[in-house]
């Protein structure tokens, strides 16, 4: 019964529909992003290891995914929590393509297939992020714009500075992948600790931050 209720809960809150654009917080300068896009830090295609952070910069920095969110407000929350007061960040507006996979839907498929509670735990930890992961990175022509902000700290609306449109942007009738990304069975000793990074781009090493907002705030205050 508990498993049935969990599946109903996840189905209700998961992203069956998606927005026209996705969003990504980063400290990478707009000019650089418009030239090269977002390149992943490595070739590890294990989505679970990216979500949990073991293949990001808090781990071995080998992830082949780039994180985005279908929620613009959530991208702002994460940026404001992680960026020190007075420092700039960019909010990128991105057109998704078939290499974008929904993390919650993929975790749910793995949970249903394996009945492994670690997938269930990860869903409940991160479903609020409305995350879509771009396998292999994000091309420059997919980046519509970059909005520059100056942080005022956690729970404070950042100061808007300017919006920059990408001259290389190409508009196309495309959307993210409607299927689930296959996540292999976990090893017996696979960690389920809540520690992960949403950056995982080779140009973003200075912007490493935990994805849990509470952890973000604690880290920012240090």
PLM features: what roles do these ranges have?
Residues 15-222:
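NAD-dependent ADP-ribosyltransferases
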Residues 4-13:
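Sec-dependent N-terminal signal peptides
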């Amino acid at each position: 019964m508990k498993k049935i209720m969990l599946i109903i809960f996840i189905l209700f809150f998961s992203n069956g529909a998606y927005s026209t654009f996705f969003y990504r917080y980063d400290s990478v300068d707009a000019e650089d992003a418009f030239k090269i896009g977002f390149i992943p830090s490595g070739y590890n295609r294990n989505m679970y290891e990216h979500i949990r952070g073991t293949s990001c910069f808090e781990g071995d920095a080998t992830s082949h995914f780039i994180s985005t969110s279908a929620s613009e407000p959530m991208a702002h929350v994460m940026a404001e929590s992680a960026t020190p007061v007075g420092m700039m960040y960019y909010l990128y507006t991105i057109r998704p393509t078939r290499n974008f996979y929904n993390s919650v839907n993929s975790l749910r498929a793995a949970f249903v297939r394996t009945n492994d509670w670690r997938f269930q735990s990860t869903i409940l930890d991160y479903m609020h992020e409305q995350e879509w992961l771009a396998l292999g990175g994000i091309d420059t022509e997919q980046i519509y714009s970059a909005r520059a902000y100056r942080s005022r700290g956690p729970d404070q609306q950042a100061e808007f500075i300017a919006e920059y449109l990408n001259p290389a942007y190409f508009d196309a009738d495309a959307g993210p992948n409607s299927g689930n990304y296959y996540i292999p069975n976990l090893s017996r000793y696979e960690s389920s600790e809540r520690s992960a990074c949403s950056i995982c781009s080779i140009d973003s090493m200075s912007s490493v931050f935990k994805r849990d907002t509470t952890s973000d705030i604690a880290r920012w205050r240090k």
